[in-house]
């Protein structure tokens, strides 16, 4: 399995070599500014680009399969790409500019995190996600929802592995479409003036980050952003959430 630091440097190199106007965002930015390193408990590496400058196809071309990256299936309305390689994931987020603000859209299952039924929805989401995407078993059973949830995953993972091998790409797309017939669009939103960028040196390479990263992080994580929270749940605790309800159109 590739190390997170190596994947980060490799991804930055790909973006820099192709002159992509990107910036580091979300949990990856938090680790760089607060911890002076990538967060060891973070599941992915977060980059952002402007939606009006690049299409998903533009980014997929530079993270092509011959570089070892595989795209996870996702909803058309999601303004992001999830690129998996050797058990790790790189997320490319496409931010939309709208007057004096900018926002990103992700599709999530509707429901209350405090509801006793919500974990059943999460389990359902896990099953669909595992079946339609090339998620490794180790990554799949890793859970942020406690030991009981992890145990349930371990009990059902073997039949899911067998079933996944039998499914065609067409069936996988139909599965994903039907499972997300109604969903909620949620993401982060920022004042546009906070998304101005500068170059810094990190891990011996040049990277692009917001000019005022502390303000961006405070806007996202709150006044206590400097206090580590390994079990942070963005959909519950994010301070700058953007919400929109839509129905599915297409699968990519």
Question: What do the predicted segments below correspond to?
Answer:
Residues 31, 48-50, 208:
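General alpha-helical segment detector with a strong preference for membrane-spanning helices
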Residues 36-57, 204:
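Catalytic metal-binding acidic patch
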Residues 30, 55, 98-100:
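Surface-exposed, flexible loop/turn segments at secondary-structure boundaries
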Residues 1-12, 16, 64-114, 121-130, ...:
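Conserved catalytic core of two-metal-ion nucleotidyltransferases
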Residues 12-45:
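Active-site nucleotide-donor binding segment shared across nucleotidyl transfer reactions
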Residues 48, 53-73:
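Active-site surface patch of divalent metal-dependent phosphodiester/phosphate bond hydrolases
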Residues 23, 41, 224-225, 234:
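Tryptophan-centered motif/residue detector
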């Amino acid at each position: 399995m590739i190390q997170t630091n190596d994947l980060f440097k490799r991804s930055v190199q790909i973006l820099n070599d192709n002159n992509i106007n990107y910036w580091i965002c979300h949990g990856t930015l938090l680790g760089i500014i607060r911890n002076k390193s990538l967060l060891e408990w973070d599941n992915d590496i977060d980059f952002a680009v402007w939606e009006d400058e690049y299409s998903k196809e533009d980014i997929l071309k530079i993270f092509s399969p011959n570089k070892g990256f595989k795209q996870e299936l996702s909803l058309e309305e999601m303004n992001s790409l999830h690129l998996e390689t050797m058990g790790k994931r790189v997320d490319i987020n496409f931010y939309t500019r709208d007057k004096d603000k900018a926002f990103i859209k992700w599709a999530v299952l509707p429901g209350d995190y405090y509801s006793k039924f919500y974990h059943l929805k999460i389990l359902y989401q896990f099953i669909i996600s595992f079946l339609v995407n090339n998620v490794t078993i180790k990554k799949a059973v890793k859970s942020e929802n406690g030991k009981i949830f992890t145990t349930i995953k371990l009990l059902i993972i073997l039949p899911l592995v067998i079933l996944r091998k039998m499914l065609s790409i067409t069936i996988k797309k139909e599965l994903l479409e039907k499972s997300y017939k109604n969903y909620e669009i949620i993401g982060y939103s920022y004042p546009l003036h906070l998304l101005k960028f500068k170059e810094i040196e990190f891990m011996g390479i040049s990277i692009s980050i917001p000019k005022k990263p502390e303000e961006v992080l405070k806007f996202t994580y709150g006044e206590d952003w400097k206090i580590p929270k390994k079990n942070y749940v963005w959909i519950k605790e994010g301070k700058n959430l953007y919400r929109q309800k839509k129905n599915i159109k297409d699968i990519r």
